Amino acid sequence: VARQIDFGAVSTPFDSLPAAEAVAVHPIQDTFVCGRRFISYKHRTLDLSVLGELPLICLEGDTSTRRYMDAFLEQNHASVHPEFELATSDMIVQFALRNLGVGCVVRDFALPHLQSGKLFELRFNKIIPKREICIVRNTKNPMSTAAKNLWTIIENAQQKKENTL
């Protein structure tokens, strides 16, 4: 018997199925980070087209983050050709720390280095829309007892969070 997963974590936007139920659990912000090599860009508000002139470090093309950023940049007429396409966001941060280029990552991955001042974020005249990490399940598939309990905890935590806003 083929076993289905109970639920998974995905980032928005995603193609939803009719039987899918999603709970947004964490907002995420995509950003471009770099080190001292690019200090001349630090206090400037840039046009997104500048990214076409910089050595970009991005995730590989088959990720939802990469597809999202490619679509955002295309909508804003910014043509980019990454210098490096890496498998993980952690690797992108490490390349940016070594001044090998400007990394495109979810801000959470670079946060410790942004707070320490080892990296800084580029600022643009267009705001990159925030996204969400969601827990998604197929309502047609029965969940195990443990999965049901965890799903309830996730839903309750999210409702509590929404009520405090």
Language model regions located:
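Short beta-strand-centered segments that line the small-molecule binding cleft or hinge
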Residues: V1-D30, C34, L97, L122
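Hydrophobic hinge/microswitch elements
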Residues: V1-Q4, S11, D70-E121
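Short secondary-structure boundary segments
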Residues: T12-P13, R36, R107-F109, N125-K126, ...
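Alpha-helix capping/helix-boundary segments
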Residues: F14-D15, F38, T65, M91, ...
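Flexible hinge/capping segments at coil-to-helix
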Residues: A19-I57, G61
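Secondary-structure junction motif
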Residues: S40-Y41, P55-N76, M143-A147, W151, ...
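A late-sequence structural motif
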Residues: F120-E162
